[in-house]
Swiss-Prot record:
Protein name stated in the entry: Elongation factor G
Subcellular location: Cytoplasm
Family matches, as InterPro entries: EFG_II, EFG_III, EFG_III/V, EFG_IV, EFG_V, EFG_V-like, EFTu-like_2, G_TR_CS
Keywords, comma-separated and alphabetical: Cytoplasm, Elongation factor, GTP-binding, Nucleotide-binding, Protein biosynthesis
GO annotation, biological process: ribosome disassembly
Job description of the protein: Catalyzes the GTP-dependent ribosomal translocation step during translation elongation. During this step, the ribosome changes from the pre-translocational (PRE) to the post-translocational (POST) state as the newly formed A-site-bound peptidyl-tRNA and P-site-bound deacylated tRNA move to the P and E sites, respectively. Catalyzes the coordinated movement of the two tRNA molecules, the mRNA and conformational changes in the ribosome.
Protein biosynthesis recorded as keyword: yes
Binding positions for GTP per the UniProt entry: 17-24, 81-85, 135-138
tr-type G domain segment(s): 8-283
UniProt-listed SMART domains: EFG_C, EFG_IV
Gene: fusA
Length: 693
């Protein structure tokens, strides 16, 4: 099967930003101008094409990463619209993992907001080249140049302003392109679909000259040959400037910055031009490298070519009411056909792909074939999980999976009736498979089912989906904080597990050294020499330790950030077994945890409050009362902006409190920042209440 679009003519991009910066509106305009959508959908009317779940249309926010395809200037653009709400950070994470480039949308009034920083760091981690779109230039308080400064200062990026805005706020009417020297003035009557191209307006000529010189100098710094030409007094051609910007963008040494107002239909076509001009195709980025599942040391390069063996990543699972299981797949090398059998390198199982679909938000186009660089949805893969690699059985390869964030909040859930019990279990299992940042677990002490997620909104949506999609009614308890335990000093434990009860006994002897491993999770080191413990028993010790750490010694919360070294031990020729060493490891680490001064940890949130000046003192006093630590204060468009760290346990009900305190005029956003030790007096209370004293 031949491909319709050459790989260099393909762009896989994400639209990412803080909530309310205008991501979905920007995507809607892109679909309108590329001819995919004949009517513009508005998020505030609940009509946006990309927001297709009922909850999204009701709440006017994007929850899942809708994927869609459009064409612009002979290029196919696959767009993934990601949520800006921190509770859905896994959706951003899995989108960035499979994208080649991204458009970061900023609010021209607010600039770089907390979630913008989080998403930017996620994109850095996955080495995703970006361009920036400063949106809402028509709003009161809009300031393009302040946004550019914030991108430099807060995100530590090198912004390349490619445009000069013509006017701002109500007077915003277009842009001047610093590369071509042409002004684009948008026609409000045609909803921005028509525009006039003119020369640089006289009142902007001086500013244009200064900014163009700054752009050329910045671009020349990225390229020795251009720097030589520039220093020699020669004029750089438009083509040379475009090529240098493209190289710098793909190398992630600079980020082009454009501006507009998506809602007023201004600046979207130049943004599309920039996507095609500056963001990479699948062949412009580093080749994907996987590992041999049988030997992780052996690296396997997966070149982006159709004729290479298949290597593809399942990055999202979803349920469609009419089709059933959908697996969203990014193909890195090779091709997939409807009806072909593929091999899951993570599970070692073979599966058959039933149908292949190109997705347009919630509409589908059936296709027979998809090649390297494509993003498609497959029907029929029943055994896959998010992060699995599918490949050919004669060339198995495992690609790097996703970083799954740990939940910070949990609630107890129970079926309203006995008849709902089985249906609830099945529905929760299905939802947990779709969304890896959502966890379901049983609490043995209370016999309750607990669901855990990234925030209250995340769990609200889950409960909502239980009713709407699965017709399951459930009662939900009050939100609980997901506390953790850790140790605060080093210790060494010598533990012998020996059991004799007629016949073959049990014998396992381990000596472990335990120390804190701050913010680095669990680490196991095997330091056994001379075969004092046979190597086939070592994994059992590790597993025993890991399972024991799931329930800490203070209050039964999971134990984190612990480094364990197995340094010595002994075994018995007859009585030793994997089970005996599993128990020895488990008991040894419990003893070590008790000796190593265990402490409780709580999730601390990064909170940003935007409040009118007259309520500042009241808001600050309240945050201090919630154990908040002020990080910074700033003024923005006539309001005060407070950034602070506050324990999650102190933030329940804050939205209602803040509303009444400021007559509804202040707002806040928060996201998980780090875990911190709980103060001794509170830790004692928590431990007592957990143990039922």
């Amino acid at each position: 099967m031949s491909r319709k679009v050459a790989i260099p003519q393909q762009r896989n991009i994400g639209i990412m930003a803080h909530i309310d910066a205008g991501k979905t509106t920007t995507t809607e305009r892109i679909l309108f101008y590329t001819g995919v959508s004949h009517k513009i959908g508005e998020t505030h009317e609940g009509q946006a094409t990309m927001d297709w779940m009922e909850q999204e249309q009701e709440r006017g926010i994007t929850i899942t990463s809708a994927a869609t395809t459009c064409f612009w200037k002979d290029c196919r653009i696959n767009i993934i619209d990601t949520p800006g709400h921190v509770d859905f950070t896994i959706e951003v994470e899995r989108a960035l993992r499979v994208l080649d480039g991204a458009v970061a949308v900023f609010d021209a009034v607010a600039g770089v907001e907390p979630q913008s920083e989080t998403v930017w760091r996620q994109a850095d981690r996955y080495k995703v080249p970006r361009i920036c779109f400063v949106n809402k230039m028509d709003r009161m308080g809009a300031n393009f140049f302040r946004c550019v400064d914030m991108i430099r200062d807060r995100l530590k990026a090198k912004p390349l302003a490619l445009q000069v805005p013509i006017g701002s706020e109500d007077e915003f009417q277009g842009i001047v392109d610093l590369v071509t020297g042409k002004a684009v003035v948008f026609d409000k009557a045609s909803k921005g679909a028509e525009f006039a191209v003119t020369g640089v307006p006289a009142e902007l000529q001086d500013q244009f000259d200064v900014m163009r010189l700054e752009l050329i100098e910045a671009v020349a710094e990225e390229d020795d040959a251009l720097m030589e030409k520039y220093l020699g007094g020669e004029e750089l051609t438009e083509e040379e400037i475009h090529s240098a910007i493209r190289r710098a963008t793909i190398a992630r040494t600079a980020v082009p910055v454009l501006c507009g107002s998506a809602f007023r239909n201004m600046g979207v076509q130049p943004l599309l031009d920039a996507v095609v001009e500056y963001l990479p195709s699948p062949v412009d980025i580093e080749q994907m490298v996987g590992a041999n599942p049988d030997n992780e040391e052996e690296k396997i390069v997966c070149p982006c070519k159709d004729e290479e063996p298949l290597a593809a990543l399942v990055f999202k699972l979803a349920s469609d009411p009419y089709i059933g299981h959908l697996s969203f797949i990014r193909i890195y090398s090779g091709f997939i056909e409807a009806g072909m059998t593929v091999y899951n390198a993570n599970t070692g199982k073979k599966e058959r792909i039933g149908r292949l679909l190109k997705m347009h938000a919630n509409k589908r186009e059936e296709i027979k074939w998809a090649g390297a660089g494509d993003i498609v949805a497959a029907v029929g893969l029943k055994q896959v999980s998010t992060g699995d690699t599918i490949c050919e059985i004669n060339r198995p390869v495992v690609l790097e999976s996703l970083d799954i964030p740990e939940p910070v909040i949990e609630v107890a859930i129970e079926p309203k009736t006995k008849a709902d019990r089985d249906a609830l279990s099945a529905a929760l299992a299905k939802l947990a498979k779709e969304d890896p940042s959502f966890r379901v677990k049983g609490d043995d002490e209370t016999n309750q089912t607990l669901i855990a997620g990234m925030g209250e909104l995340h769990l609200d949506i889950i409960v909502d989906r239980l009713t709407r999609e699965f017709s399951v009614n459930a009662n939900v308890g009050k939100p609980q904080v997901a506390y953790r335990e850790t140790i605060s000093k080093e210790t060494k434990v010598d533990h012998k597990y020996a059991k004799q009860s007629g016949g073959r006994g049990q014998y396992g002897h381990v000596v472990i050294e335990v120390e804190p491993n701050p913010e680095k999770g669990y680490l196991f080191e095997n330091k056994i020499t001379g075969g004092v413990i046979p190597k086939e028993y070592i994994p059992a010790v590790d597993k025993g330790i890991q399972d024991a750490l799931k329930s800490g010694v203070l209050a039964g919360y999971p134990m984190v950030d612990v480094k364990v070294a197995l340094v010595f031990g002994s075994y018995h020729e007859v009585d030793s077994s994997e089970q005996a060493f599993y128990v020895a490891g488990s008991m040894a680490v419990k003893e070590a945890a008790r000796k190593a001064s265990p402490v409780l940890l709580e999730p601390v949130m990064d909170v940003e409050v935007v409040t009118p000046e007259e309520y500042l003192g009241d808001v600050m006093g309240d945050l201090n009362g919630r154990r908040g630590k002020i990080q910074s204060m700033d003024s923005r468009a006539g309001a005060q902006v407070i950034r602070c760290h506050v324990p999650l346990s102190e933030m329940f009900g804050y939205a209602t409190d803040l509303r009444s305190r400021t007559q509804g005029r202040a707002n806040f956003t928060m996201q998980f920042d780090h875990y911190e030790r709980v103060p001794a007096n509170l830790a004692e209370e928590l431990t007592k209440s957990k143990s039922g004293e």
